[in-house]
C-alpha cells in the first residue's frame, strides 16, 4: 500500500502550537480504512492516521500533546519478529501523550473502532462498535539509565439490541470484553544500545492473539474478524529485546519471547485450548564503518497447543540469514533508513497448526533478495 504524509504547523502563541498530522483522507469506522473504489484493489490506498495535536493548550498539562482525530497510543514493536507488544489500532478518539505526572509521564487514549462480528459459519457478519481505553505510565526512573512503564488496556463493545439478538438467536459470536495489563523495564548501556524486558497478561480475544504462532500482536480480532467462544481464559507473555556493542566493531541484537495460555480460544485449535511457545532471534554483525555492516541472523521458534480433548499440536522451525546492510548509523534497531542484501534458509520442522508447505510441497526454502526499511 502507498502511504503519504502531511504535516501543517500553526503557532498560536509563544507557548502553544497546533499541528495537523496524518496520511490524507481516512474513514472513521474501521482502523484500516481504504481510499478508492476499485474492486480488484489495484487503485486502493490504505491510511492509518489523521488527527490534530496541540501543545500548551491544557493548563494542567502544558507540556503534553493533546490530540483529537483518528490516532492511537504509540506502538511498541519487537522489530526482529515484526509484531508489537503494545498496539491499539488507530481509531477515532482523543488522547494525551507525555503528560508529566510525578516522576514519569502519562499516555492515555480513548478511541472507538468498528469491528466485524461473524457468525459460526464465518460467512455472515455484523458491524459492532468497540470502545478502548489505553493507559500508560512511562519513563519512571529506577536507577542509572533505567526506566519503567506500567500499562493497561480495556476494550468493551457498545452493542445495539439487534446485534445482541443476532448473538443470542442467530448464531453470531458473543462479544466478550477483553483487557491487557503489563509492565516493561528499559535499560540503556554506557556504550550505546539498550535492552527492554516486558511482562504482559491478557484475557479473551487479546489472549487469543498471544497464542498465534505468527503475527502475535495484541489485537482484539483475527485479521479484522471477531469470532470465537471466549471463556475468560488468560495468557502471559515475557519478552526481551535489545542490542549491545561489543568492542568497536561488533554489535549483537536479540529478541526472545516466551508465552503461555490456559483455557483460551485458539484460532487453530478452538475453545478451551492451552498453549506454550518460545521464539528466539540473535543477530550479530561486524561494523565496517558507520554505513556498512555484515552479519548473520539465527532464529528459532516452537509452539505446542493442547485442545479441549488434550490432543497436542506442534509447530516449530528455524531460519538462518546472511546479510550486508547499507546504513546511516551503526544501531541495528534504532537507525533507519537501511538497505539490506540477504540470503536466507528457512526450515519448517513441524507444522501441525497450519499445515503450511513451500512450493512443490517442500518443508524448506532458500531465498536471496534485497529490501529497504524506511521510517517516517
Where are the regions a protein language model picked out?
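Outer-membrane beta-barrel pore domains and translocons
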Residues: 28-31, 69-73, 111-115, 153-157, ...
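Residues that flank catalytic or metal-binding motifs in active/ligand-binding sites
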Residues: 46-48, 64, 90-92, 129-133, ...
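Outer membrane beta-barrel
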Residues: 21-118, 130-147, 151, 343-348
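Leucine-rich solenoid repeat modules
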Residues: 316-339, 343-353, 357-360
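Outer-membrane beta-barrel "beta-signal"
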Residues: 322, 362-376
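Detector for outer-membrane/organellar transmembrane beta-barrel domains
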Residues: 135-159, 164-307, 316-322, 326, ...
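Extracellular loop and loop/strand-boundary signature of outer-membrane beta-barrel proteins
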Residues: 35-38, 78-83, 116-124, 160-172, ...
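Glutamine-centered polar micro-motif within alpha-helical contexts
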Residues: 1-27
